[in-house]
Swiss-Prot record:
Reactions the enzyme catalyzes: L-asparagine + H2O = L-aspartate + NH4(+)
Name of protein: Probable L-asparaginase
Family matches, as SMART domains: Asparaginase
PANTHER family assigned: 60 KDA LYSOPHOSPHOLIPASE, L-ASPARAGINASE
Major location (coarse): cytoplasm
Source species of the chain: Helicobacter pylori (strain J99 / ATCC 700824)
Entry-linked InterPro entries: AsnASE_II, Asp/glu_Ase-like_sf, Asparaginase/glutaminase-like, Asparaginase/glutaminase_AS1, Asparaginase/glutaminase_AS2, Asparaginase_C, L-asparaginase_C, L-asparaginase_N
Keywords: Cytoplasm, Hydrolase
Active site: T16 (o-isoaspartyl threonine intermediate)
Highest taxon above the source species: Bacteria
Family: Belongs to the asparaginase 1 family.
Length: 332
């Protein structure tokens, strides 16, 4: 029977889903304690829906995720996706930076096959740990034919998300992941997958970014978080460290103080690419109080600062033309 089942490649990177603690009733634990074999051993029912080919890419807390692992993960995922024997790829990942890794993969992988990222909010030794069921659901989504050509997906807490929209919204709740601007793309319940919408922004096979043309390190892009009474000091420090681009997590509709705005304009005139995003959890950034064309700024649409940074890093490998980069933010 197993020979007739689809083959899913499981790439493990660590995180809470692979974490372990001493006391099941306490919140303290260490991420990345369990290897991929131990994860699979805890879910024997996976063998009823797929043949799992597991590999360990890294075993870290996702606060330590970096470009080097991104490239290693993406290259291995692409190799597996190009293998006709593999139906899809599932990636276990810590939740802290999951949305950034997922968006990077959504822009650089080229395949119509399902790619699903999954994590957990409670470590494997916790009371009512959520990782095992989340992983079972992620594999269920990956083996479903309707999951093809939807770009990279995130599965958490019975819910299927497009990676462009998904964001972590709570530090501890298992329902932390939300798509605040557009809603979830579908749901999964004990293996039954349902979709309600189709991604419209460019992803995977439509993307102009290719792993074969990229190299690490990517162009340096910083995020500057603004606040009342903000001065340009941190922004200037970013420029002094040779940032090629800066994403501004502005207040409200991506706004900044008058003094900060002047510093941004001067940097833009020197060739630094400035993207205005927002520290607000939802909504888009538009040219309202700030005339972005006149200042030479780019608006992030409704991409949050961390995803805007990923897109800008990749965009800068292609061009420094601000009009073209603005188009990318409207297309991806």
């Amino acid at each position: 029977m197993a020979q007739n089942l689809p083959t899913i490649a499981l790439l493990a990177t660590g995180g809470t889903i692979a974490g372990s603690g001493v006391d099941a009733s306490l919140g303290s634990y260490k991420s990345g304690e369990l290897g991929v074999k131990e994860l699979l051993k805890a879910i024997p029912s996976l063998n009823k829906i797929a043949r799992i080919q597991g590999e360990q890419v890294s075993n870290i807390g996702s606060q330590d995720m970096n470009e080097e692992i991104w490239f290693k993960l993406a290259q291995r995922a692409q190799e597996l996706l190009d293998d006709s024997r593999i139906q899809g790829v599932v990636i276990t990942h810590g939740t802290d930076t999951l949305e950034e890794s997922a968006y990077f993969l959504n822009l650089v992988l080229h395949s119509t096959k399902p790619v699903v990222l999954v994590g957990a909010m409670r470590n494997a030794s916790s009371l009512s740990a959520d990782g095992a069921l989340n992983l079972y659901y992620a594999v269920s989504v990956a083996v479903n034919e309707k999951s093809a050509n939807k770009g990279v997906l995130v599965v958490m807490d019975d819910t299927i998300f497009r990676v462009r929209e998904v964001v972590k919204t709570h530090t501890t709740h298992i329902s932390t992941f939300k798509a605040l601007n557009s809603g979830a793309i579908g749901s999964v319940y004990y293996g039954k997958t349902r979709y309600y919408m189709q991604p419209l922004r460019k992803h995977t096979t439509e993307s102009e970014f290719s792993l074969s043309q990229l190299k690490t390190p990517l162009p340096k892009v910083d995020i500057i978080y603004t606040h009342a009474g903000m001065t340009p000091d941190l922004f200037q420090a970013s420029l002094n460290s040779h940032a090629k681009g800066v994403v501004i997590a502005g207040v409200g509709n991506g706004n900044v103080s008058a003094g900060f705005l002047k510093a941004m304009q001067e940097a833009s005139q020197m060739g630094v690419v400035i993207v205005r995003s927002s520290r607000v959890g939802s909504g888009g950034v538009t040219s309202g109080e700030i005339d972005d064309k006149a200042y030479g700024f780019i608006t992030s649409d409704n991409l949050n600062p961390q995803k805007a940074r990923v897109l800008l890093q990749l965009a800068l490998t292609k061009t420094n033309d601000k009009a073209k980069i603005q188009e990318m933010f409207e297309e991806y």
